Every structure is written in C-alpha cells, then in structure tokens.
Amino acid sequence: MSDKPLTDLTFSSFDLHPALVAGLESAGFTRCTPIQALTLPVALPGGDVAGQAQTGTGKTLAFLVAVMNRLLIRPALADRKPEDPRALILAPTRELAIQIHKDAVKFGADLGLRFALVYGGVDYDKQRELLQQGVDVIIATPGRLIDYVKQHKVVSLHACEICVLDEADRMFDLGFIKDIRFLLRRMPERGTRQTLLFSATLSHRVLELAYEHMNEPEKLVVETETITAARVRQRIYFPSDEEKQTLLLGLLSRSEGARTMVFVNTKAFVERVARTLERHGYRVGVLSGDVPQKKRESLLNRFQKGQLEILVATDVAARGLHIDGVKYVYNYDLPFDAEDYVHRIGRTARLGEEGDAISFACERYAMSLPDIEAYIEQKIPVEPVTTELLTPLPRTPRATVEGEEVDDDAGDSVGTIFREAREQRAADEARRGGGRSGPGGASRSGSGGGRRDGAGADGKPRPPRRKPRVEGEADPAAAPSETPVVVAAAAETPAVTAAEGERAPRKRRRRRNGRPVEGAEPVVASTPVPAPAAPRKPTQVVAKPVRAAAKPSGSPSLLSRIGRRLRSLVSGS
C-alpha cells in the first residue's frame, strides 16, 4: 500500500444514485481508495471485474457501491418474482460475511434495499423465513446457501443479475469452488449476469475461474512496492517452545492498552494461550472453530468496542475482518502458508494507519520462515530474546470501558467459554445420535449404536448370545442334558439321525402353529416337542432319561430352525 491510501477521486464524481451518494457521505466516505478508483469506472457501467488488492484497501466498499447502484438505477429482470434476490455476495468465512453485511447496512439501510445474511452455525429456520419473505441482496457463505438452493428450494437464483466473489483465493483453499460453480450455473448466463471477483492474489486457478464464468473480465491490480503494507513494522524473534509464552507476556506488558491480536495455528493452542493471558490479568477473547458462532460474534463485538484487550485466534479471523485500531499482531505460531502471514499482519495498519507485526519462529514452525520471506520479497528484521524481555513489567489498572459492566458476557472466562463449547458439541452429537433411531426415538437393535457392556435398553443384563452353528455341528437343543429325543422306531433311527449326505431327499419336517405339515413324519408323543436333530454319533442315538424338567412344548429355537432350513437347502441342491 502506498503512503497515501486515498486518491483525489471522489464518489460524487461518478454517476451514482443521489440516495447512494448521500448514504456514503453520511457514513464518512467521500474519496476513493486506489482499488475503488480502478473498479468503479468499469463496474458501474456493467462490466465484469477481476480485482487484486491487499486486505484493508477498500475492496468491500468498491463492490458494495457497484451492487447497490445497479439495483437502484436499473430495473429487475422481467421474469423475477418479488421474493427472488437480485444480487448475491459470497464470502469464504462467516466472519467476513458478517463484516460485509455490517458495512452494507451501514450506508445502505435507507436506500429501500432488503439484505439477508446467510451462514451456518445459527438458526436455520429463522434464515429460511427471511429468505422466503423476499430480499434484494443475499450475503452468504457457500455451504448454507447451497442447502437452501439445492435441498429445500427456499431461494431461486434465476433472477440474480449481479454476483460478487470476495476472497476468491480463500474459496479455493477451503474447497468451495465446486459450490461456487454450482451456484453460478443457477444464475442467468454470464452475458446477462455481471460478476465481480476480488482476491488478494490473482493466481492461475482464480483467473481460470474468472474466464470460465465471467464475461470478458477486466483484470485490475493495485501495484505495490511490497506485498505487505508499508506501514507495518515487522520483526521476528527466535524463542524456544518453552520461552514463547513468557516472551509474549513480556512484550504485551510493554504495550499496555494497545488493541492486540494473537494468531496461533491450532484450536488447542487458542485455549492454552488465552488461559495463560487471562491468568495474568488480561481481558481475552477467542476465535476458533471450537467456539459456537453466536459466542464468536459476541466476543468479536466486545473486542471491537474495546471491552477486550486481546483476541486470540486461528486463521478464521485472518481475512476480511475490519477491526479499527489494531496496533499489534502477534504470530505466536508462524503460519504454514506464506499468504496466511500476509493476511494475518493485514489486520493492522489498515487504510494508512501504522502497526506492528511480531512473529515467533520456534523450532516447531521456523521452517516456514524462508517461504514467507521469499513471498513478501524482504527479510524480516530479527530481534534477540533477552532476559529483560522475558520479564513482564507490572501491569497498571485498566480503566473500565463504557458499557462493559452491563455486558451479559462480561463475566465469561476462557475456561467457561470452552467448557460451554464442549457441552454444546456433546449435546449436538447426542441429539444427532450415535446410531440410527427407530420410531419415537428408540434405538434400533443392530444399528450399531447400542450398548457394548452386555446390558439391554432397560439396563438389565442380556442373556449370553449363542454362538452361530457351523454346518455339520450338532444342534445344541439335542444335547444329552436337554430334553430327550423321542424316536419313533428303531428302524427309522438311521433315517432320522443320518448325516446330511445320507438323508433321503424329502421335504424337511416343519411346524406351523403347532400342527404337523403334510408329508412330515408322525410324532409319537401326544404333545408337540422340538423336532429331532442330528447328534454327534447318529448310529448310536437312543432315548435317554430326563435329567431336567422338560421345557414347555412349543416351536424350536430360532437358531435351530435357521440351521435346519439351511441344511434342507443344501441337501435339496
């Protein structure tokens, strides 16, 4: 970014709708930034744009002005229904979508345009009702919008006349490109639809997407002397893993009161670092995928108001968030991707302000440094880790920010936030169920979600399961300790007890409701008894005395019937 972030070109010099000019002026926007000065002359007449500029240079306002002006001065498509959206703005992350929506409402609320914010992690039905009522502009993340378009037909994009893709390179990183292509194919063809694409880097894959789905886009690049903002003072330390927290505390104690962001690489270290800072008296907020969406929004809002001193985050907050007055950005962990380094330090020194970017290159992540320096085309100055820096200075009492005491979340500690997050995640998993459920929510047997401790659904012990019988083994029901087998005659014994290969090819005996089936052998006993089965020594089977009380008459066990049926099928073949 140049030392002069604003140009001499004013918004009033363009042929904008009068209400839009008034809204911009009331919001404090009068002169254009370089990317706005390049974009608006192409986008306002209806041309497609593929724009590249650093974060914090005003890309959001550039496309919002183009979108709103088109909707105000041009009629809608002829086949549009009142509830169909006319414009779609896609962002890769929830935080960026929320930021865009906030900026849009800031100066577009009085223009008569209806905005809808659509993203995951919040009330599904509430967003669906808002879309069904009809909106002019949808600001969304791809995942939730795909669900409304594809699954439930809540919204139709056939009358969407302008589409914006913000942070297109990040769309690729997060795997959203298939979703983007799906949505673009549901809109009018590119000759009718205007498309604006913005990215911090116009890589080959981003340009491929642009030329595939855009109508002869004009490539606009804001030239800079360096990849990183010129007003960011960068420096790097080489601490050991054990020194990182102590060094962070020492540096923070030397910048009391400055709004600070600390970036780490993993969600686990977000909690660990935030807990350490909180124990030393800092008011800390956290942004990571483990924190529920509503809590993330609340913490971000408190940080923007100055009620929180430090925000510890993963790369979920590295792009698109515009937070005024961030003076220090700490890379507690060097990022794996060099582009992420640029986006992280881009949270400070926005729109001509100054800021400091301080990085720690420990033995775990120091291998990323050469790629980062090659990407930004400069060497990052190295500072020594001294004993003085490892000694935190005494903290001065912090003044209470207006409205802080009445904030509902002001008493939330880092431990409370993550404990509630874990409880919420466990409740969500329980609600989804470990296995499938039958009618009424009862668990089905055999679905894979049952208990593994031998207890039934009512908590009582189950009887042991029988081992499946292998072909050729004796039926357990015919063991000597069971009810004896009654043999009709000695001459018939071999036919009844012979091995499977020696049986006569006849229909097996079966019972239906306790009555013999036609063709079955007569039963000597007056009461129904289990059908005879082949013992281990067929030629020596004789009736044996009863050693235990006879079981009540009834059908053979399920396993016995299955085994006999299988043997009959084998012998019949």
From Swiss-Prot:
Q: Which GO terms describe its cellular component?
A: cytosol
Gene3D superfamilies with a match to the protein in the record: P-loop containing nucleotide triphosphate hydrolases
GO MF entry, a single one: RNA helicase activity
> Where is there biased composition of kind Acidic residues?
402-411
Q: CDD domains of this UniProt entry?
A: DEADc, SF2_C_DEAD
Q: Where is this region: Disordered?
A: 391-559
Helicase C-terminal domain location is 231-393
- Any idea where the Helicase ATP-binding domain is? 40-220
The source's domain of life comes to Bacteria
Motif DEAD box, per the record, lies over 166-169
- Listed GO biological process terms: RNA catabolic process
Low complexity bias: start-end ranges: 391-400, 476-499, 516-528, 541-559
| Enzyme Commission number(s) of this protein | 3.6.4.13
Record's protein name? ATP-dependent RNA helicase RhlB
The coding gene here is rhlB
